[in-house]
Regions:
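Glycine-rich phosphate/ribose-binding loops and adjacent secondary-structure elements
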Residues: 105-198
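N-terminal capping/small domains of soluble enzymes
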Residues: 1-102, 113
């Protein structure tokens, strides 16, 4: 992935000391990262790397990765030569096997599909919050979809963020920068009276 094991664990510990949470990212849950933070956000992306319900049940929040600012509208590709034994274990792959993420969820397409999955998350966890991560592109339409799917929170990923899997042309030129995107998102949430969504 984009971050080393040591970096992910250090960020988890630092976030805990700061009183905030940490997110698994699309690559799956590193056990030591989760164990060192009491506010762990578990993310499921289109590749569903390493997904299991027992991992969801160890988390304090869960969200769908519907988009990413650095590579909006695309999937991901971690070349096989970067898939070490540890990455393979976390992602449910074989060492050396490329990690390919499709551009969208093959089995979740409608808001009702996501809502059903979200209900299962809440049922299995005693009601942890379920959210959506979206790229800052079609902000209002994506918020409408997330709200219809029953999101408790929305993560808005603006232009300028980075990831090892993002082409420079997308990372540097596509999407709305985060601060203006937040203003648009807040205005739209107020307009549709989605006060329950953070």
């Amino acid at each position: 992935g984009a971050l080393s094991r040591e970096a992910k664990i250090a960020l988890s510990k630092g976030s805990e000391l700061a009183g905030t949470g940490i997110c698994s990212g699309e690559g799956g849950m590193l056990p030591e990262e989760q164990e060192n933070n009491s506010r762990y956000f578990y993310e499921i992306a289109t590749g569903k790397f390493g997904f299991s319900w027992d991992k969801v049940e160890k988390s304090q929040a869960f969200h769908f990765k519907g988009g990413q600012g650095a590579k909006t509208g695309t999937g991901g590709h971690l070349p096989g030569d970067k898939v070490t034994q540890e990455i393979a274990d976390v992602r449910g792959l074989k060492p050396g096997q490329p990690a390919i993420s499709p551009s969208s969820f093959p089995d979740l397409t409608t808001a009702a599909d996501f809502s059903k999955f979200a209900d299962e998350v809440r049922s299995r966890t005693g009601g942890i919050p379920v959210g959506f991560k979206i790229a800052a592109s079609h902000i209002e339409a994506d918020i409408d979809f997330a709200v219809e799917a029953g999101a408790d929170y929305i993560i808005l990923d603006g232009r300028g963020g980075g990831t090892g899997a993002a082409p420079n042309i997308l990372r540097d030129n596509i999407n709305v920068p985060t601060i203006p995107a937040l203003a648009r998102a807040r205005r739209h949430l107020d307009k549709i009276e989605a006060k329950h969504v953070s």
